[in-house]
Amino acid sequence: MKQILNPLKNSNKIPIWFMRQAGRYLPEYKKVRETTKNFLDFCYDVNKATEVTLQPIRRYGLDAAIIFSDILVLPNALGWEVDFKENIGPVLKQFKSQKDFQYLQRDSNNKLEKVYKIIKKVKEKLPSNTSLIGFAGSPWTVMSYMLEGKGKRDFRTSKKFIYENKILAKDLLNFITEKTSDYLINQVKSGVDLLKIFDSWSGVLAEDDFTEFVIEPTKKIILKVKEVFVKTPIITFPKGAGLLYEKFIEEVPIDILAVDQMVPLEKMKEWSNKVIIQGNLDPVILLTNKEIIKEKTYKILQAMKGKNFIFNLGHGILPETHPENVEFLTQYVRLYEQKNSNSTF
């Protein structure tokens, strides 16, 4: 069995992979990326997206590959205007009123077929003991990008919109939820072993709104996927949820909970009795030196020893990260597995 699908309590094997493990910090990624000007075209290029998905597996021997794509591929495939500007990031047409639904299609216009082809091609080339992760953005996070027109930190436009336009906001949320469910189901049909739902902006919502716009749509997606693929594990990542992580665990039928670096280790240990926990080394640690990486990693590994646990970061690998530090971290986790001791090394 592929280890990442079965990170069992008391197992000596600690599954390890990283968010944004394929990306700008890798020289081999940059070499491929330079060949395509437009980022979305790059995401839809079957050969190039396949290659960069496999690069960190070749380099580090990680337990899982995650399909190279972006959470905004889905709205783009549904007809929404999405662009990526250099040194700015994603720029989208703003959703402002009911009439904007005319720009959203019920059909993905065959663009998503390219994603499914990438999955199939990666699957053919991936080592048999390496799991393949598919993903999508959560409805709230995708919706907030559409409402803001770009990524922001306070999301006041999005929150103002959902307060003032409750029915329209729910219509948009439900549309994205339905399409996200279909998208993830088709990813499993194409060959992924498990799924991840990225909710990058869940932490900006108060409790009632968190329930309505994060918990409820996530539940709907999971239940719909599980109707078709009951055994496919699903990772959820309501980043920045803080105290609401516990409400999320209680109300969402999750298999694996990814947590950010702000979550205390004691909470991770406690929650691992209910779900598999994934996390949560601060990505900034990988910008430091080997001694600091070793110290911080050891603390997490000791706390989660014998627990239902997947080692990962609290967010994605940063672009300025040295690949050698990622290599060191991976080897250190492997060494910890071998030693499986309380002593430092």
From Swiss-Prot:
Pfam families: URO-D. NCBIfam families: hemE. Belongs to the uroporphyrinogen decarboxylase family. This is Uroporphyrinogen decarboxylase. InterPro entries: UROD/MetE-like_sf (IPR038071), Uroporphyrinogen_deCO2ase_HemE (IPR006361), Uroporphyrinogen_deCOase (IPR000257). One of its GO terms (biological process) is protoporphyrinogen IX biosynthetic process. GO terms for cellular component: cytosol. The record marks 70 as: Transition state stabilizer. Homodimer. Substrate binds at residues 20-24, 39, 70, 145, 200, 315. Pathway: Porphyrin-containing compound metabolism; protoporphyrin-IX biosynthesis; coproporphyrinogen-III from 5-aminolevulinate: step 4/4. Its EC number is 4.1.1.37. GO terms for molecular function: uroporphyrinogen decarboxylase activity. It comes from the Bacteria. It is found in: Cytoplasm. It catalyses: uroporphyrinogen III + 4 H(+) = coproporphyrinogen III + 4 CO2. Keywords: Cytoplasm, Decarboxylase, Lyase, Porphyrin biosynthesis. Catalyzes the decarboxylation of four acetate groups of uroporphyrinogen-III to yield coproporphyrinogen-III. The keyword Ligase does not apply.
